[in-house]
Amino acid sequence: MLVLDSSVILAWVLDDEQPLGPELLRRLSTTEVAAVPVHWILEVTNGLRMAVRRRRLAPGDPRRILDRISNQPIQVDTETVVRAWRETPILADDHGLTTYDAAYLELAIRLDAPLATLDQDLASAARKAGVTLFG
């Protein structure tokens, strides 16, 4: 299991240069399951909408991309909602993160799972918290 930040999946579907893509896809297509907090799909869909607005994607692309993503072994963690009342804001304060990013950190800590992220602030906080980074 690994925790998947929306930055990684957006870079993958938007064909941005990023080193995690091939290895992540290999692991997801074999045995790896990605855990994501409940707000993950909102971040992904918002990122796709922004890509359409910026003309990086055609208007019909997000639906096809979401179909592709939905076929990946991604498990939405509903416990994130419960943790948002206490642990997540504490992590956000301790590491100077948004609560959205702190939710990824909380999930990685709780699951004792590596974190896949392209966000440098989140990666730095993960290292400080003893979380292994994927890639």
Model regions and ranges:
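Short glycine/serine- and small hydrophobic-enriched flexible loop segments
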Residues: N46-R53, I109
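Acidic catalytic patch
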Residues: V38-I41, D61-D94
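Acidic, PIN/NYN-like endoribonuclease modules and their adjacent C-terminal/linker elements
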Residues: M1, L105-G135
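Short, well-structured N-terminal submotif of metal-dependent ribonuclease cores
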Residues: M1-H39, A51-R63, K128-A129
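Alpha-helix capping/helix-boundary segments
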Residues: V8-I9, W40, R83, Y104, ...
